[in-house]
Structure formats: structure tokens, C-alpha cells
């Protein structure tokens, strides 16, 4: 038998997963014989020879371990479930927009915490969340139909919403056209909050939220409600200051 430090492993690859497999093996102390599959013909021949459907494939001491996920399991590491839900995308957005608001306040006023910091945090969040929805407008609109009360009655609202959220966020950041941006934010935030509350807390439905776009695995819940409540609070605040 060979010690881990000297054990030989072969990685057959033609894509980024091969680089990840090689990095993981080296981090575990393995010497890697990195064998590239340079052409489609070579890749197809390799798959046929070993009866596999994907590359890369890892072999340790002439024993086939499998693909990258199989390699992680071999080392006892967690393998991400592609269907698992997570609040991480929304939390990342809020963290980045909060830090950006602090930075903007520091630049504009010489202090990170000012009256504008919270305003900018909310308006920046609206802009980023709206932008994420706009990346896949059809996907968002379809997912939105699962729970939004207005979209279920008037389907085109699913395509209008991302533009309304982004536009209101931009105008609120600039404190421009408050007579337009605040009512828009109040309207879409109010409908959104009612929709999420009904779906989650009354109907007890387990749905995915379209808050970061149509392909997200974010569960519909408290953070989804928070997005809408922030828009409502921002709209009321700006209307009160007019």
C-alpha cells in the first residue's frame, strides 16, 4: 500500500471541474497525474471505455472514484444538493448593499452612519434585487405567478414589477421624482407583502421566492416579506418628508 503523501491519482478532464478535482486531490496530499482530454473524440472514447457519462473522472491507485461529487464523498466532504433551498443569495445582496450604503455615506458626509445610510441601503437593495430579476425576466414572471396576488389576476404585472422596483430604487437613491417613486414602491411593496403573507403564513405553502430572479432556490418566507416591508417603509418615509 502507498501512503497518502505518495499515492498516485489520475484525473481525466477537459473542463473546470477537472481543475477543482486536481486542487482537491493536491490539498489532500495526493500526487496528480493530470491527463487532459483534448478533443471531443478523445472524450467520447474515454466515456465509452469506462462506461461513464461525465468528465472529469478520478482514479486513485487504479480504482475509479468517479466525478467531482464522488471525489468529495470519497473524502467525506459535503456535496451540495442542487435542489436545496437557501437564503444565502438574499443575505449576500443585503450584506453588499448595506456595506455600499455605509461607504456612500462615508464618502458623502464623512461618516458611515447618517440619516441617508438606511435610505441608501433600502434603495440600493431595490436596485440590485430588481436587476437580478431583469436578468431572466420570463423566468421571474413565471415564478412570480405562483404567489403574487396581482400577477395571478393580471399576468403582465410579472413583467412590469422588476422595472418598477429598479426604477423606484434609482429615483429614491437620487431623491428625485418622489411623487412618482414613493407611490410606486408603496404599491408594489404592499401587494408583495400581502401576497407573501398569504402564501406563507395563511395558506402554508412551501414555494420558492422570485426575489433574486427566476432561477433562484430561495424559499418564500420572512426574507421575502422583508424586501416588501422595506419598500413600504421607504415609501412612507419619503412621502412624509415631502
Located regions from the model:
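Single conserved hydrophobic/aromatic residue that forms the stacking wall/gate
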Residues: 1-8, 12
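Short cysteine clusters
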Residues: 15-18, 209-211
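Alpha-helical transmembrane segments of integral membrane proteins, especially early/N-terminal helices
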Residues: 16-17, 21, 82-91
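Conserved helix-turn-beta segment immediately C-terminal to the redox Cys motif
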Residues: 20-35
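Thioredoxin-like thiol-disulfide oxidoreductase module
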Residues: 35-52
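Membrane-interfacial helix-loop segments of redox and metal-homeostasis proteins
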Residues: 49, 89-242
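Structural micro-motif
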Residues: 50-60, 68-69
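Non-catalytic, surface beta->alpha helical segment in thiol-disulfide oxidoreductase systems
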Residues: 61-84
Amino acid at each position: 500500500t502507498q501512503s497518502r503523501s505518495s499515492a498516485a491519482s489520475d484525473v481525466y478532464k477537459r473542463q473546470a471541474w477537472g481543475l477543482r478535482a486536481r486542487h482537491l486531490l493536491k490539498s489532500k496530499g495526493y500526487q496528480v497525474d493530470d491527463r487532459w482530454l483534448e478533443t471531443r473524440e478523445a472524450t467520447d472514447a474515454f466515456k465509452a471505455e469506462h462506461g461513464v457519462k461525465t468528465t472529469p473522472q478520478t482514479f486513485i491507485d487504479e480504482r475509479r472514484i468517479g466525478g467531482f461529487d464522488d471525489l468529495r464523498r470519497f473524502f467525506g466532504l459535503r456535496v451540495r444538493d442542487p435542489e436545496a433551498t437557501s437564503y444565502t443569495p438574499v443575505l449576500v445582496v443585503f450584506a453588499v448593499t448595506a456595506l455600499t450604503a455605509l461607504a456612500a455615506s462615508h464618502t458623502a458626509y464623512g461618516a458611515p452612519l447618517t440619516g441617508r445610510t438606511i435610505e441608501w441601503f433600502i434603495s440600493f437593495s431595490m436596485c440590485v434585487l430588481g436587476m437580478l430579476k431583469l436578468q431572466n425576466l420570463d423566468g421571474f414572471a413565471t415564478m412570480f405567478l405562483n404567489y403574487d396576488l396581482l400577477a395571478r389576476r393580471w399576468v403582465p404585472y410579472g413583467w412590469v414589477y422588476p422595472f418598477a422596483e429598479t426604477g423606484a430604487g434609482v429615483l429614491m437613491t437620487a431623491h428625485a421624482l418622489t411623487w412618482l417613486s414613493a407611490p410606486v414602491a408603496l404599491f408594489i411593496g404592499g401587494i408583495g407583502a400581502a401576497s407573501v403573507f398569504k402564501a406563507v403564513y395563511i395558506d402554508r405553502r412551501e414555494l420558492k421566492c422570485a426575489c433574486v430572479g427566476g432561477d433562484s432556490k430561495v424559499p418564500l418566507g420572512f426574507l421575502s416579506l422583508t424586501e416588501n416591508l422595506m419598500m413600504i417603509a421607504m415609501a412612507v418615509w419619503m412621502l412624509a418628508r415631502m
